[in-house]
Amino acid sequence: MGKPQETILIIGAGIAGLTASRLPTNNGIPNIVFEASTPERNQGFAISLQEFGYSSLLAALGDLPLSNLTRGVAPDRQIGGTGWIDQALRDNRTGELLVAPDLTTMKQTIVRANRNALRHWIADCGEDELDVRYGHKLRRIEGKLGDITAVFENHAKYKGSLVIAADGVNSTTRSQILPNVIPETIPLIHYHGEFQVSHSAFDKLIRPHSGHSNILVGVGDRFNTPLSICNVTKTKVHLDWSYSRPVKGENDTLYRPNVPSEEAKQIPPALLEELDALSLAEPWKNFLNSESLKTHRVFHWTTRCVYITQDDARRAGEQGVVFVGDSWHAMPIFGGEGGNHALLDGVELANAIIKSTASGGKDGWDNVVKSYYAGAWKRSQEAVRRSTQRFFLLHRPAKEWKEISEKKKKPA
């Protein structure tokens, strides 16, 4: 079936694809990463990294300390921060603290990371530079495991032994190899906004409420409004907000799952009206209003989940394709675990490749694929279901939040 010594072709330069490239590169295993976009693409929002995700990556990179990661990726790294979050939930209409862990006994296990910074940090964690080729949009895959060719829209062709599909929820690779797997659209409204303020404005308007936490989570009556630090520079604090809620009936004007990409960047009047009617408390009301949104970059995000059966994974493997990241386990962003499983995918697949290569490749590519999916399939597919359920639980009625808060206050 071919020895695991030939070039690996990786489609997509997100955190899963870069992890799947960095670790083999550090072990002398040739691979090429192909990315459809330009090097300037922006994914500057922040994500939450959990211990099960980053600890595996740090171990695979040579037992690096957590401080190495936080110095490189924490949104507040330029002011000495470590990406810390308080894990608290507040009533976004009163500011009341509803749920919060005991900060005196809690160690930092969740790290906020700027996504752009994380991509660069992974790419830089080794002596040899990664071979990332931008402007390569996949057209099709030809061949089989051990002898496969990737053909791109710029007419470039590359041969390899294995294709790693790291090209996201709308994976071109998956749509060709497994056309029966169609992302499931979740009936949720999700708008995302980006803006920046001066340090003095941040210290006046947000810091009194957030403290040193990199995210200020506000929950309401079936809707959420988290405010998050994306990046801190010498002069500005870059932030984002989300407004999310379940769909209301069949004629919800804000539910536009198939909106064209350019139209998704436009602010619908119905959103402005809805935000102004929420009666938010500070600091949310200072930013989530029709006047402030005039200076924000606002995006409509469609929430989609992807499930792949074991048989689908096996069939794709026989055709020379293995999946990592959102291409096979996309899940809700807020309350999800997607970035962590993307890291874990890259680590576990790379470990299977490295192990097979160390044995002289006698196991073949088919056993690399089987070894990877033996653990990754159940882990990731369960996470999709868990994250989707958690998303709806985080959008519960205000009455239920109050009941939870009261129970937390009662002595054990």
Curated annotation (Swiss-Prot):
MF GO annotations: FAD binding; monooxygenase activity
Cofactor(s) annotated in UniProt: FAD
Glycosylated residues (UniProt): N68, N92, N170, N231, N251
Signal peptide boundaries: 1-21
Pfam family, one: FAD_binding_3
Alphabetized UniProt keyword annotations: FAD, Flavoprotein, Glycoprotein, Monooxygenase, Oxidoreductase, Signal
Assigned EC number: 1.-.-.-
Family membership: Belongs to the paxM FAD-dependent monooxygenase family.
Its job: FAD-dependent monooxygenase; part of the gene cluster that mediates the biosynthesis of neosartoricin B, a prenylated anthracenone that probably exhibits T-cell antiproliferative activity, suggestive of a physiological role as an immunosuppressive agent. The non-reducing polyketide synthase nscA probably synthesizes and cyclizes the decaketide backbone. The hydrolase nscB then mediates the product release through hydrolysis followed by spontaneous decarboxylation. The prenyltransferase nscD catalyzes the addition of the dimethylallyl group to the aromatic C5.
Protein name: FAD-dependent monooxygenase nscC
Organism: Trichophyton rubrum (strain ATCC MYA-4607 / CBS 118892)
Lineage: Eukaryota, Fungi, Dikarya, Ascomycota, Pezizomycotina
Gene name per UniProt: nscC
